[in-house]
């Protein structure tokens, strides 16, 4: 074979190889393009609220303070998304932002439903005059409810809610078995305790030995009750003894009082 024939043969094979190469590249591009376009159409379909709308929201869980209207308002914007594109995390956050909702769990349920389980706050006490304390000792903000007016009034630093709630349970238990009720309990920023009984008597308990001081009041109260004047305040911040404030004048009279208050 002459040199010129070899060159023609090589060019023909090179042209054939190039044709195969470009054909393969074109086919691969077509396949990739089809996948991309198909993915785009699928994405558009799944995110089209008119094609796959959320048709219902099923609410489970016992509710006392959270109404259907509250839930509807909280979710009205999020429900404009399709069944697949709705952000479950945002739905959960919107529900947990409702004042009386403690926790919310949300899941999709085919073909067009969201299933929601709500756990409401369980208020244990009024807190600092404007908020609530739940049964876990956590502070939360929510509107007042007439049926909760009977709850005790507790106050103190917000990070001490658990301690105040625990102290209330202890003090109230001791008072209750001795015929008293505890209406409010306050912990000051300096960690001093003040209790108000259901009959209006204020007990200054100080920072130490509050349970022993409550017991001292219970022991001495029959003696105080025999006095022909109303008791307004009892200062128990002493190692032994106490001081009594009588009536509206709040004049204090020491009884077996031999130590400085603390």
Curated annotation (Swiss-Prot):
Report the principal subcellular site: membrane
Some GO term, biological process aspect, for this entry: which one?
FtsZ-dependent cytokinesis
Q: Where is the chain membrane-spanning?
A: 21-41
Organism's domain of life?
A: Bacteria
UniProt domain POTRA: residue ranges: 52-121
Do you know which PROSITE patterns this protein is assigned to?
POTRA
**Role played:** Essential cell division protein. May link together the upstream cell division proteins, which are predominantly cytoplasmic, with the downstream cell division proteins, which are predominantly periplasmic. May control correct divisome assembly.
Q: Give the protein name, as stated in the record.
A: Cell division protein FtsQ
Source species = Shewanella oneidensis (strain ATCC 700550 / JCM 31522 / CIP 106686 / LMG 19005 / NCIMB 14063 / MR-1)
What are the top taxonomic ranks of the organism?
A: Bacteria, Pseudomonadati, Pseudomonadota, Gammaproteobacteria, Alteromonadales
